[in-house]
Design a protein with these regions (language model features):
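Bacterial N-terminal signal peptides that target proteins for export
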Residues: 1-10
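Bacterial N-terminal signal peptides
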Residues: 9-19
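Alpha-helical transmembrane segments and their juxtamembrane interfaces
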Residues: 15-16, 112, 193
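Metallo-beta-lactamase
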Residues: 21-155, 176-181, 200-204, 237, ...
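Short, structured coil segments at secondary-structure junctions
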Residues: 100, 224-225
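Active-site-proximal loop/helix segments of hydrolase catalytic cores
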Residues: 153-224, 235, 239-242
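Residue-level signal for inorganic ion chemistry
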Residues: 229
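A Lys-centered signature of the CheY-like receiver
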Residues: 232
Length: 280
């Protein structure tokens, strides 16, 4: 259901007017983490892990400084911290890991991004919207992971704006800042970029219509400038290839043979690139 570009542009312009001009300086650090070193350290060496997306991954501790990332499907990733904390993004009835995570994040734009009946064994269910109204606010520590959110707006079903209906969730662990854009419906102004801080790994919806048109998503990617960007929320090869055709004008593109990879601060790319994990 493609929509006109920049349908929320007016509200974003107003946010930009009140935002601090010192955005770049504030984004040098990842809030809540010490990040005094250079943004990029050396060329990435992605360590593949056996298994398929959504397979059972036990809660064994990982080597210090290493974070597991598995593309389960649609907008759901499984993030595993060095101490074994397991986080499922945009956890829903249709797409979820085989074993219950410790933390589940959700967004409300469509039913494929949230669950009305999350597994009761999940210790922390974090909704990207506030059922009582206003923005959701999450700021919690789960062992070695700091989790927070940045609220954004969504289109309502009448074509208007539902304020604070989506959250960009940020997971900070092992000196990495991993941001999941959720069901993003508008570009990001200085206010959002300041709240995000430094982003090392960006999980990006690339459908080109239900979320953002591809042109606008490119603007988001360039503004955040994360070393590693991983596509999600595409509905088959044609949707993905349309995004990648536009992305190649700005970033190198690589493909992983495995849906599960290992990330670390030491192996971040020296310059931004897109890595495609198998699945959809």
């Amino acid at each position: 259901m493609p929509v006109p570009r920049r349908v929320l542009g007016l509200s974003l312009a107003l946010l930009s007017l009140v935002a601090s001009p010192a955005v770049a300086a504030e984004r040098e650090g990842c809030p809540g983490l010490v990040a005094s070193g250079p943004a990029y350290l050396k060329q990435a060496t992605l360590v593949e892990r056996p298994g398929t997306a959504g397979s059972f991954l036990d809660r064994a501790a990982r080597p210090e400084g290493q974070v597991g990332l598995t593309f389960v499907g649609h907008a759901t990733f499984l993030v595993e911290s060095p101490k074994g904390v397991r986080i499922a993004t945009d956890y829903s009835e249709s797409t979820r890991p085989a074993a219950p995570p410790d933390v589940a994040t959700m967004n409300k734009a469509h039913g494929t991004h949230y669950s009305l009946r999350p597994d009761p064994r999940i210790k922390h269910v974090l909704r990207g919207w506030n059922p009582a109204g206003g923005p959701a606010h999450h700021d919690l520590q789960v062992e070695d992971v700091h989790i927070r959110n940045v609220s954004t707006n969504i289109r309502d079903w009448g074509g208007g704006t539902e304020y604070d209906g989506n959250s960009i969730f940020v997971f900070e662990t092992a000196q990495l800042c991993i941001a999941h854009l959720g069901h993003l419906h508008h570009t990001l102004g200085p206010y959002h970029l300041r709240k995000l801080g430094r982003v090392d790994v960006l999980l990006v919806p690339v459908d080109g219509g239900y979320t953002l048109e591809t042109f606008d998503m490119m603007e988001v990617l360039k503004a955040i400038n994360a070393p590693l960007m991983v596509p999600m929320h595409f509905f088959g090869p044609s949707t993905l290839q349309r995004f990648l055709a536009a992305a190649r004008e700005h970033f190198p593109v690589e493909f992983s043979p495995q849906a599960s990879i290992t990330l670390s601060r030491e192996t971040l790319p020296q310059s931004p690139k897109i890595l495609v994990l198998p699945g959809h």
